[in-house]
Amino acid sequence: MTMEVDILELSDRSAKFVLSNVSTAFANGIRRAMVADVPTLAIEYVNLYDNTSVLYDEQLALRLSLIPLATDIETYLPQAECDVCGGEGCPACEVSLTLSAEGPGTVYSRDLISSDPKIQPADPNVPIVELKKGQKLVLEAIAHMGYGRDSVKWQAGVACGYKNMPVITIENCDACGHCAAECPKGIISVEEAGAKIAEEDIMKCSICRLCEQVCDINAIKVDFYENSFVFTMESDGSYTAKDLVLNAANVIKGKAEEMLAILDQL
């Protein structure tokens, strides 16, 4: 059977879609790739030339490393995989960002000046530190490509999960209303003819089966499709939601091609 994708919601940072005719292992592979295997840019080193703020150098470096950066996966390579410099650092695998600020005022992520105009903080209003009168902050930050499996700062997918597509059947209901009262999602309504669930609300079901447990006549049954999954994901801004899913799929494709190449040599 051919894999099917039905997009339910899509914005720059989040998406919700139904992935059908795939195994649980494949669905989990997509989720894991979005979280751990799609490389992103994040600040790795910070050279502090002047810091008279209330924060220690190490605290500033940590805050800077956790600021998501818009990533161009076509231009930059993870440093360990860079053929240009052999992992020493070069324009093909790293980006320089500078910052110079003097108080009074709050320093924000938008104050970082990138050597590559395409690489900017995904959120311009992330506060870094508040400077009082006379305090200064001058630094250079070096951003590298990396993987979420190595550090959370390189994790592009911040909220990626899936569940099996629910299947709910209602037969011979006596309209007692117990199932509707027990449903934590509030998706069951009761009419004179019996309990009812709107088609668009079925995906909200968490498959807790509380409605089954309170039904004395076993009129309602909750199950799920084993090969259909409802995905919900959010990006940290390194990529758009669409690009993150596509890059995750390409990661899985690349691994499969590598395995086939190895098997062909046997």
UniProtKB/Swiss-Prot annotation:
Instruction: List GO terms (cellular component aspect).
Output: cytoplasm; DNA-directed RNA polymerase complex
**Keywords tagged on the record:** 3Fe-4S, Cytoplasm, DNA-directed RNA polymerase, Iron, Iron-sulfur, Metal-binding, Nucleotidyltransferase, Transcription, Transferase
Per UniProt, the cofactor note for this protein states: Binds 1 [3Fe-4S] cluster.
State its location(s): Cytoplasm
Alphabetized InterPro entries for the sequence: 4Fe4S_Fe-S-bd, 4Fe4S_Fe_S_CS, DNA-dir_RNA_pol_30-40kDasu_CS, DNA-dir_RNA_pol_insert, DNA-dir_RNA_pol_RpoA/D/Rpb3, RBP11-like, RNAP_Rpo3/Rpb3/RPAC1, RNApol_insert_sf
Chief place of localization: cytoplasm
Tell me which Gene Ontology terms the entry assigns under biological process. DNA-templated transcription
Q: Where does [3Fe-4S] cluster bind?
A: 205, 208, 211
Instruction: Name what cofactor the protein needs.
Output: [3Fe-4S] cluster
Q: Subunit structure, briefly?
A: Part of the RNA polymerase complex.
Family, according to the entry, reads as follows:
Belongs to the archaeal Rpo3/eukaryotic RPB3 RNA polymerase subunit family.
Q: What does this protein do?
A: DNA-dependent RNA polymerase (RNAP) catalyzes the transcription of DNA into RNA using the four ribonucleoside triphosphates as substrates.
Its protein name is DNA-directed RNA polymerase subunit Rpo3
Instruction: Tell me what organism the protein belongs to.
Output: Methanosarcina acetivorans (strain ATCC 35395 / DSM 2834 / JCM 12185 / C2A)
The uppermost taxa in this organism's lineage are: Archaea, Methanobacteriati, Methanobacteriota, Stenosarchaea group, Methanomicrobia
Its gene?
A: rpo3
